[in-house]
Every structure is written in C-alpha cells, then in structure tokens.
A protein has these predicted regions:
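Membrane-embedded transmembrane helical bundles of large multi-pass transporters/channels
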Residues: 1-49, 55, 105, 132-377, ...
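Adenylate-forming
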Residues: 70, 396, 757-758
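A short beta-strand structural signal in non-transmembrane regions
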Residues: 78-86, 96, 110-170, 405-412, ...
Length: 769
C-alpha cells in the first residue's frame, strides 16, 4: 500500500501535494463553504430577472432602436383587454359604463361590433391614465377586476405582466427542482454501488447550485430563460465530475485506506475533470459570441455553473468522501447497471453497415433540419402546462383574437403629412386600424391636427369671434409669427391641438378668463388630448399605432411590413422611418438567427476539435467524434420537420451549443476506453468492453440531462423555456443513442485512419484511462 502511494507521489507530485492539502484541511474548507453558502442564499434576492427578450436584441436592430426611442419620447399608458363571459349585450354595456367611470380609467372601448361582442361574450378594451409599470395602474386594474368579480372574467394586460410571469416561473421552478431531485436520487440509486455515495453527491450538487445562483447578482440582471434552466442544467452538465471522483475513490480504496484513496483519487481526477469540463465550457463560450445577447447571458451563467461545480467537487467532495468513507464501506450493494455486451456485439456485427447509413442519415438530417419551421415569437408556441395567468390570456385571444400591434415612428413637425400618411395606411388590406394625431377626432368632424382659422375655432367651441381673434393674435405673438399679425389673423390657421393647448395654458396662467361652460368643456377635453399627445407626439418624432391583419411572423407578415414601410416612404425619407412591434422583433431575431447559428456551429465544433486534438493527439479522431455529435444535433432538429412541429429558434441555438459541448463527453468516454483497451486486446473485443465500461457513466449523466430537459418541457408554463427543455431532452437522447449504437462502428472502421493521423506514437493520457 505504501509503495503504491509513494509511486503516485512521484508520478504526480504537485497534484498529490494539492490533493493532500485539500483532504487534510477539509474542516477549513467545510467552514469556507458554509460561509459562502450563507452569503449566496442571502444574495439570491439581489438578482434581477429580465422577462423581456427584446432587451437582448443587438443595439443596431430596428426594433431595439425603436424601443429605445419610444422609451425616451413617448408615454405608453397601461391597458387591458377584459373578457366577460355569459352576459347579454345590455348587461355588458352597463358594466362598461360602470368601469369607464372608475378612478384611473381614461378610456374604454366597447360597442356591438364583432370585435367587442358576440355569442354572449363581451370584450372591454380599457386604457388607464398612468403608465403600465406603476403601482397605481396595477391598483386600478385590480379594482376593475374586483368590480367584475361576480362574472366569469378573463383578461390580458401589459400591467404587471412581468411580475405575473416571474411568479409563474418561480412556481414552475419549485416543481421542476422537486421532480429533478426525485429523478437524480433514482438515477444515483440505480447506478451507484453504495448507498452512502448518494448524500455525498447531493450535498456537492446543492452547494454548487447555491454558489452559482447566489453569485448571479454579479451581472446585475439575468434573463428569465437563464434563471429558469440554469440550476437543472448545471446538475445535468456537471454530474460527470462528481461521478469521476467517486469512481476514482472506489478504485483506489480497494488497496488503500480511505485518506490515501481520496488523496490519490483527487490527484488523478483533477486533470481528468478539468479536461472533461473544457468541452462543456467551450459550448457555453460559443454562445457568448451570439449577436442575440441572451446567448452571452446564458453562456456566462452556465460557464460559471460549471466552474462552481468543479470547485465543489475539488474542494468539498473529497472531505465528504472521507467523512462518509465508513458508511460507504458498509452500504455496498450490487450494481443495477446491466452489461451491454449484446449492444457491443451488435456494433461489431454492423460495423460495415451502420457507418454508411450514418453518413446518409446525417446528410438527410442536415437538409431536413434546415427545412424545419423556425419560429421567433413565443406566442406561436404552446406549452404542455398553462398557468392561470397564461390561461386567462389564451381565453381572451381565443375568443377575440390576438392583437398584432405595430408602431410606426416618423419625424414630427408636419401634421398635414401625418394625416396623409394615416389615410394611405388605412387603405391597406393588412392594416386593421391605425391611429395617430392626424386621425383622432377632436370635435364635430375636425381632427386634432386640422388647421382652423379664428372663425372656425370660435364656432367649434362656442367662443366669441372677437375673443378668438385676440387668442390667435396672442398665439402668433407667442410663436413669433409676426407675418400673421401684420396681414391680419382672420385667415391665420393653427392646428386645433396647438391652439387648444395654448388656450389651456393661458387659462392656467391666469392670463384669460372663460365662462363656466367653456372652462368645463376645456378641462374635460384637456386630459384626453394630453393622453393622445403623450402617446403619439414626441420631442422629435410622431408615432402611429397600427393593428395588423396578419400573424405575428411569417412570409405574409414580412410582406406586410415591406408594404407598410413603402407606403410611409411615399411621405418620409425611408431612412427616417422606424417600425416597432412583435412583427419587427421576430424579423430581427430571424435575421440574426442565421448568423448566430453559424457562430454556434463553427465555434463549438472548432473549440471541441482543438481540445480533442490535444487530448487524443490525433487529427482524425476529433473529426469522427464531432461529426457524430453534429449529426445527432441535425437529427434532433429534423424531428420537428417530420412531426410538423415548430422549432423555437432560441432552443436550436442553445441546445446546439450544449449538445456539442456536453454530450461530446459521452463520445470521449467510449473513445478513450477503446483507445486504451485496444493496446492489449483485439479491436472488436476492445469496442465491446469499451461500451460496457463507459455505459454506467453515460447512463448516469445522460439520463439526468434527458430527464432535466423533458421535466422542463412538460412542467414549465413558459413556452420559450418549455421549447428549450424539449429540444434539450430530445437532443441528449439522440446523442446517447448515436454514441452507443453508431460511434463504436465508426471507431472500428476508422481505426486505420485514426492510427495514421496520430501526431505521435499513441499513448493514452493517464486521465482518460
């Protein structure tokens, strides 16, 4: 025993010294981890979660520029679409009148058209007098819903939507983590050889997860997607590291006492785990290069999770293994993982059949995956589970349709041009309705931006003509329009909105006095005009709000956007026009998808091939392994095409990186075992035995990642998160099947090529033994 330990020290002196320090100072490390965990638990609430994917669009995209401009120049008041079921029209009208009189409600649309009433169901379109993100607006919405609580009511609103989405995600995560915990324990019970290993694994996993989640505040804000899946993915991606150390310990413990076994096992596991983690981290790093910046958000958090997992395995788990060593010795049981010799024999027998089929299959999968229907809007997706919030929104959309709103932003300063543009837009078949200052009626058929002379204005608001002339003269003087004063103001025309606001300001300043009736009319109209002005007229730009007759995304929508842009371009310079809405956001995401897809595919493959090149000292092996996993990625995303399902673009990008970066480890395990075994046995026997030796590791890690993906898919009520989970579950399962049923044949057939492409005489690295 002493001789073996001495040999290990000579072979790996630095690692042995480091491992000895970690094991002997384990109590100190326990204390450090306890302090860090307490700090991280307290820090979790400091993390802000962003539920808006548009904030991750590149700054150069039209949608991002438009959203930033609207935030700075325009006010968007809170609104809600409220569905009341099983009511007559008269009942609905009474309720609408009641709601319209409530505090905080500035406007309510309801009539007897199909857009607002049909089949005993009514839709109230309510606009409030404050912005959507204020507590007052949320309170007003709650009061409206309370007033309608005696009826069967559903609603869709931008007010408090982020909070409702966050609550849904938090509730989903509790269920996901509980189910994942059950699956993890079940898998560990099935694949372990001693029951006392399980608390060691679980403690290590939990600590690593707490450290990662508690340090997310370093980045200020993280996306809801990252927040939802990071913990579960961390467990699935990093479980290999704990398994490697535990297996090393069990091997060394056969002829060494517990302390020496842990030290030697750790000294050997550190380089092996570090090497294994590089491929996974490379996939995360590749995501960070995406134009769509959520890739950076997910990539850096998941890369951090891998690092913290290694920290927990290197500095916490050795002490736990030593602490639990007696229990581990006393709770040994027979391994439940079966030998898969039959699969190995199948691989040997089909070594000339499967590789050609694999090549053809990969080529077909490549073309099919490119033909899949990629979607960019979560409204196009459906989740298996629906929260009360999502169900309420779906009911409104089901009965009265989704609202596809588009904002058109143009330079302001010419009301006549705006009115002409709005009239042109109203004639388009793709436009259901459009609103701007130029087509909002003020009084008696006059629009807010129509120009009126003093007589017209006086007749409109029932004002003496002499008073009107005086007010117009004061306005001309205020605007330094001396030409109007010289030529006389009787023909001087001023836009109604400008003259109205000028008179109101003069009244408020005490410069003029109006009779009671006129003052009441002025006051009542002022708030409505201000609401319209705040939403549609900015410091430098005007905004038109359109409702489209097309889906959120697709060729029809793209054509509609082009038609709208070309129509507006008849009146404005095309470079000064901005279109902003779900439709443009989806288009921008689609435009960046092709580039991001290339970045993910090329960088992950390149990073992994470089790592494998140094690991195996062969130019041929990395190509075989990467092609196998890339083939599984294409096969994964060809399934939706065959099943006539939509593919969420973010799911494709994220899972492509994870699948290449993480599941390549399964191929590495089999390949490293095979390369070692074939040095002292025939290659056919080596392939069979390599599968038997690698299967426990693959089934443990793989089943956890597959389960994590499918649990996320079927539990999450957020369609985007669910789509990523489904793609992850399918992708990992595809990789496992391909690695077990096609990689051995590829290795056997490519053995000669691999031998010829060795950079030096083959010597299996010790950490891959």
């Amino acid at each position: 025993m002493a001789d073996n330990a001495e040999k290990d020290k000579k072979d790996n002196s630095f690692m042995m010294k480091l491992a000895t320090l970690i094991v002997d100072k384990r109590k100190g490390f326990y204390l450090i981890f306890i302090v860090l965990c307490i700090f991280c638990v307290l820090s979790m609430n400091r993390v802000k979660v962003n539920n808006d994917l548009t904030t991750y669009l590149p700054d150069t995209t039209e949608t991002r520029r438009g959203l930033d401009l609207m935030d700075s120049e325009f006010t968007t008041y809170g609104s809600a679409r409220i569905l009341i079921c099983n009511v007559t029209f008269d009942e609905a009208q009474k309720l609408a009148d009641q709601v319209e009189e409530m505090d905080g409600v500035s406007m309510l649309d309801f009539d007897d058209t199909e857009d607002h009433y049909h089949d005993m169901e009514a839709l109230l379109s309510v606009t409030f007098d404050e912005e959507a993100d204020t507590e007052a607006t949320q309170q007003h919405l709650d009061e409206v819903l309370d007033a309608l609580s005696d009826y069967d009511v559903y609603y869709s609103s931008d007010i408090g939507q982020e909070e409702r989405d966050a609550d849904d995600l938090n509730n989903d995560m509790i269920v996901i983590l509980l189910l994942a915990a059950v699956v993890i324990v079940a898998v560990l019970l099935f694949t372990s050889t001693t029951y006392a290993e399980i608390p060691v694994y679980l403690t290590t996993f939990i600590v690593a997860a707490i450290l990662n989640k508690g340090t997310n505040y370093w980045f200020g804000t993280i996306s809801f997607v990252t927040n939802s899946i990071a913990v579960v993915l961390q467990l699935g991606l990093a479980v290999d590291y704990a398994i490697i150390l535990a297996h090393r310990f069990m091997e060394e413990h056969e002829d060494k006492d517990a302390r020496e076994a842990v030290i030697v096992a750790l000294s050997k596991a550190i380089p092996e785990i570090s090497s294994s983690s590089l491929t996974t981290i490379s996939g995360m790093v590749a995501m960070m290069f995406m134009q769509f910046r959520i890739g950076y958000d997910m990539g850096i958090i998941l890369a951090k999770s891998i690092i913290f997992s290694m920290v927990a395995v290197f500095f916490l788990m050795p002490g736990l293994l030593l602490t639990f060593s007696k229990a581990i010795d006393n709770t040994h049981h027979k391994s439940f993982v079966p030998k898969i010799t039959a699969v190995g024999k199948f691989c040997v027998a089909t070594r000339y059949i499967i590789p050609p089929i694999l090549i053809v299959g990969v080529i077909i999968a490549f073309f099919l995956s490119n033909k899949a229907n990629y979607v960019y809007d979560t409204n196009t997706l459906e989740s298996s589970t629906m929260s009360d919030n999502k169900f309420s929104v779906s009911m409104v959309n089901k009965e009265f349709g989704m609202v596809n709103q588009l904002a058109v932003i143009v330079p302001n300063g010419d009301y006549e041009k705006e009115a002409q543009t709005l009239k042109a837009l109203e004639k388009l078949d793709v436009v259901k309705s459009c609103q701007g200052l130029g087509n909002i009626e003020a009084m008696d058929g006059y629009m807010l931006t129509d120009k009126l002379n003093p007589r017209q204005f006086a007749e409109l608001i029932d004002l003496d003509i002499e008073v009107a002339d005086m007010l117009y003269s004061a306005y001309a003087l205020d605007q330094s329009d001396y030409g109007a004063l010289v030529s006389g103001v009787s023909e001087y025309e001023v836009p109604f909105i400008d003259m109205f606001l000028f008179i109101y300001d003069q009244k408020e300043s005490g410069n003029i006095t109006l009779d009671d009736d006129l003052e009441e009319t002025l006051t009542d109209a002022y708030s409505q005009i201000c609401i319209a002005k705040d939403q549609l007229l900015g410091e430098d730009n005007s905004r038109f709000v359109l409702e489209l007759n097309v889906p959120y995304e697709g060729e029809e929508t793209t054509a509609a956007l082009d038609q709208i842009r070309n129509t507006v371009a008849k009146f404005y310079n095309i470079d000064d026009i901005l279109l902003v809405g779900n439709a443009t956001s989806d288009k921008d995401l689609g435009d960046s998808f092709a580039t991001d897809n290339t970045i993910i595919t090329v960088l992950t493959a390149l990073f992994v091939m470089i790592i494998l090149l140094f690991t195996f000292q062969s130019a041929g092996l990395p190509v075989l392994l990467v092609v196998t996993i890339q083939g599984s990625i294409w096969m994964n995303f060809s399934l939706p095409y065959l099943l006539n399902e939509n593919v969420y673009f973010l799911g494709y990008l994220v899972v492509s990186a994870i699948q290449m970066g993480a599941t390549i480890d399964y191929a590495i395990v089999i390949t490293s075992r095979y390369m070692d075994l074939k040095t002292y046995m025939p290659i056919k026997e080596a392939a069979i035995e390599a599968l038997n030796q690698a299967f426990p590791t693959i089934v443990t890690s793989g089943s956890m990642l597959v389960s994590a993906g499918f649990i996320i898919s079927y539990v999450s009520s957020n369609a985007a998160v669910a789509a990523i989970g489904l793609a992850l579950g399918r992708g990992t399962l595809t990789s496992i099947l391909l690695v077990l049923l096609a990689l051995p044949q590829t290795l056997l057939i490519g053995d000669i090529t691999v031998s010829y492409t060795h950079l030096r005489a083959h010597e299996t690295p010790e950490h891959l033994v």
